């Protein structure tokens, strides 16, 4: 399955490929290649939702301290982000900022902040744009009720997602580990079962 906003880019690439073929087959092949990359990038695989607090993004954990976990998403990771836990969306706020390369941890970055209120406290998900990831798309609005693993947004063409959690949780993944949105359990609290 492909995320809905990818279809327009794929269609435009294939149309340009047909027109470019009149100029030169090699130019046409470049557009076909871009269409194939776009189809791969905008893929929307089914996920089996994990039992604890789940990762909000696909990628590699590159920072973990206290109650904060950061995930670097390369252009080859699926870029659809998911709710780490079920609850009510308190707010969705876009914060303007710079767009450095996603592998560089930096403050003042273009960010979409999603706060999810749960029975165990507030989860904060930050979708951060990078130099190539210029567009952050949010699928949720203030007041929405989300389920754990539900799609909450997408960052186009690679970047970073941050998860900040309430007190009382312990991370079960470490720096360098690969995670999958909605599927990989990122942290647990043994005192209650998954929402």
Swiss-Prot record:
- Top enzyme class of this protein? lyase
Q: Which residues cross the membrane?
A: none
Q: Which residues form a coiled coil?
A: none
* Signal peptide positions (record): none
**Localization per record:** Cell membrane
List the molecular function annotations (GO) for this entry. phosphatidylserine decarboxylase activity
What's noted about post-translational modification?
A: Is synthesized initially as an inactive proenzyme. Formation of the active enzyme involves a self-maturation process in which the active site pyruvoyl group is generated from an internal serine residue via an autocatalytic post-translational modification. Two non-identical subunits are generated from the proenzyme in this reaction, and the pyruvate is formed at the N-terminus of the alpha chain, which is derived from the carboxyl end of the proenzyme.
Q: What's the protein's topology in the membrane?
A: Peripheral membrane protein
Cofactor binding note of this UniProt entry: Binds 1 pyruvoyl group covalently per subunit.
What residues form the catalytic site here?
159
What protein name applies here? Putative archaetidylserine decarboxylase proenzyme
Main location as per UniProt: membrane
What are the GO BP annotations of this UniProt entry? Answer: phospholipid biosynthetic process
Q: Give the Enzyme Commission number.
A: 4.1.1.-
Which organism is this protein's natural source?
Archaeoglobus fulgidus (strain ATCC 49558 / DSM 4304 / JCM 9628 / NBRC 100126 / VC-16)
What are the alphabetically sorted keywords of the record? Cell membrane, Decarboxylase, Lipid biosynthesis, Lipid metabolism, Lyase, Membrane, Phospholipid biosynthesis, Phospholipid metabolism, Pyruvate, Zymogen
In the record, Pyruvic acid (Ser) modifications are located at 159
Q: Any S-S bridges, and between which cysteines? A: none
Q: How does it assemble?
A: Heterodimer of a large membrane-associated beta subunit and a small pyruvoyl-containing alpha subunit.
Q: Which reaction does it catalyse?
A: archaetidylserine + H(+) = archaetidylethanolamine + CO2
In terms of superkingdom, the source organism counts as Archaea
InterPro entries reported for this sequence:
PS_Dcarbxylase, PSD-A
Family label: Belongs to the phosphatidylserine decarboxylase family. PSD-A subfamily.
Q: Where is this site: Cleavage (non-hydrolytic)?
A: 158-159
